[in-house]
UniProtKB/Swiss-Prot annotation:
Pfam families: CbiA (PF01656), GATase_3 (PF07685). The gene is cobQ. InterPro entries: Class_I_gatase-like, CobQ/CobB/MinD/ParA_Nub-bd_dom, CobQ_GATase1, CobQ_N, CobQ_synth, GATase_3, P-loop_NTPase. Residues 253-441 form the GATase cobBQ-type domain. Keywords: Cobalamin biosynthesis, Glutamine amidotransferase. It comes from the Bacteria. Belongs to the CobB/CobQ family. CobQ subfamily. It comes from Azoarcus sp. (strain BH72). This is Cobyric acid synthase. PROSITE patterns: GATASE_COBBQ. Pathway: Cofactor biosynthesis; adenosylcobalamin biosynthesis.
């Protein structure tokens, strides 16, 4: 397959709509019978997924694979950076941990990372009719241009055309598009075939003069203006977006809260709770009062000791004691599970200097962080009722031991037991991400938390419906013939 059948979607900013547009195009193409694969050369994200080949990739690429109706694979995201501090990250190459590097050291490593990127891209180019590539952040970050492998550096190396997407909802869309284009080199500018504007609300006729000006100013077409799709619920790539903090609902019965630590990871684990019509779910950020709740969920963390210290500084430790004293329930997932134990040891300095810290003491377990990361997709049943199906995945470097493990949270199909339940039955911990991803597990866990007779939420069905809704919008509002014709004129 010629590399001309690849198209790269770059954005004027982070959260401009790159991931969404790639997912929508992928679903639209696969519905036409086209074999298409997603690809992101380098992703920096704390939300990740486990692939069928036993590796780890960004969650956005896993979602795009679902959109393309193929199994997620490590080639879809060959370089994943998981920040562990403001100046360093865990570097994952082809799904496996390579090292923890500072920003300066990673910059020196980029030529090696680029080789991994090109190897994955070449494999995908040989297997699929089209490859839809997603950039990262903005291609016009001047300080990141040297040795760039995420945006134009990759586009130049792979010789692929580019479409620029911008979010009109945040304002300044014309300045974003024109400014980005003008900050590119002449050869990079020549790759940009045109634009897509995302999240438009209002009368398109009032926008048309601006679109005409943009085409006249740049000599490039606007391929489409995607509307603001209210209620679209797709897996977030990384940080919690505005509007995801609270989910007030009339008629909500169960109050659920979760802290937003600095290095929160895989917060998508709680999506089913945020969608549940009988759950009043709230993220609690730094400096915010900790409200009363029926259930507290401690989500995953990339830097467990540091986020545990943050919890203490924010007053969560006494709040959890009060919560349990008055009969509340607590669930800890992965890093949150580790925090609930009596001690957390990092003898190899995986998260900083080697150290051992006291946990919250809600579970009788001790955790030691080990060098080898566990990456596996699993299925099983909740031990609470022995019946509710669970389908999730493990991404962790900790090994836990202790008496409360004798009361597991989940019984896995491979014969293992996972997690722990406290002696009083109020605290549950598990290493399984995706704990709430099946309707049966949602119903059983909410029943345990106090919402008797709770209904389930089918997250997979909702995801499929929203991907089709997104693809419908792409088909209706993006001139796909013009887009792909401009990208691949020889194939038109």
């Amino acid at each position: 397959m010629s590399k001309a059948s690849a198209l790269m979607v770059q954005g004027t900013t982070s959260d401009a709509g790159k991931s969404t547009l790639v997912a929508g195009l992928a679903r639209a193409l696969v519905r036409r019978g086209v074999r298409v694969a997603p690809f992101k050369p380098q992703n920096m994200a704390l939300n990740s997924a486990v692939t069928a080949d036993g590796g780890e990739i960004g969650r956005a690429q896993a979602l795009q694979a679902v959109a393309a109706r193929i199994a997620p694979h490590t080639d879809f995201n060959p370089v994943l950076l998981k920040p562990s501090s403001d100046i360093g990250a865990q570097v994952i190459i082809h799904g496996k941990v390579m090292a923890n590097l500072s920003a300066r050291d990673y910059h020196a490593y980029k030529p090696t990372a680029m080789a991994a990127v090109m190897a994955s891209f070449d494999r995908l180019s040989a297997q699929y009719e089209h490859v839809l590539i997603e950039g990262a952040g903005s291609p016009a970050e001047i300080n990141l241009r040297d040795r760039d492998i995420a945006n134009m550096g990759f586009a130049e190396a792979a010789d692929v055309p580019v479409v620029l997407v911008a979010d009109i909802d945040r304002g300044g869309v014309f300045a974003h598009l024109v400014g980005t284009l003008e900050l590119l080199s002449p050869s990079e500018q020549a790759r940009v075939r045109g634009f897509v504007i995302n999240r438009f609300r209002g009368d398109i006729a009032l926008l048309q003069p601006g679109l005409d000006w943009l085409t006249e100013r740049t000599g490039r077409p606007v391929f489409g203006v995607l509307p603001y799709l209210h209620g679209l619920f797709l897996d977030a790539e990384d940080a919690l977006a505005n509007g995801q903090v609270a989910a007030d609902r009339d008629g909500a019965v169960l109050k659920v809260i979760a802290p937003v630590y600095p290095r929160i990871s895989n917060h998508t684990d709680l999506d089913a709770l945020r969608l549940h019509p009988q759950v009043d779910f709230r993220w609690v950020g730094p400096g915010q009062a900790i409200p009363p709740a029926d259930l507290v969920v401690l989500p995953g963390s990339k830097s467990v000791q540091a986020d545990l210290a943050w919890l203490r500084a924010q007053g969560w430790e006494p709040a959890l004691r009060r919560h349990l004293r008055y009969g509340g329930k607590v669930i800890g997932i992965c890093g949150g599970f580790q925090m609930l134990g009596s001690t957390l040891a990092d003898p190899h300095g995986l998260e900083g200097a080697p150290s051992t810290v006291a946990g919250l003491g809600a579970l009788d377990i001790e955790t030691v962080l080990e060098r080898e990361k566990q990456l596996v997709n699993v299925r099983g049943r909740l031990a609470l009722d022995g019946e509710a199906a669970v389908a999730g995945y493990e991404i962790h470097m900790g090994v836990s031991r202790g008496a409360d493990l004798d009361r597991p949270a989940v019984l896995l199909e491979d014969g293992r037991a996972d997690g722990a339940l406290s002696a009083d039955g109020q605290v549950l911990g598990t290493y399984l991400h995706g704990l709430f991803d099946t309707p049966q597990a949602v119903a059983a866990l909410l029943d345990w938390a106090g919402l008797k007779g709770a209904a389930g939420v089918d997250l997979n069905a909702r995801r499929e419906a929203d991907l089709d809704r997104l693809a419908d919008a792409v088909e209706a509002h993006v001139d796909m013939a013009a887009l792909f014709g401009a990208a691949w004129p020889d194939a038109a």
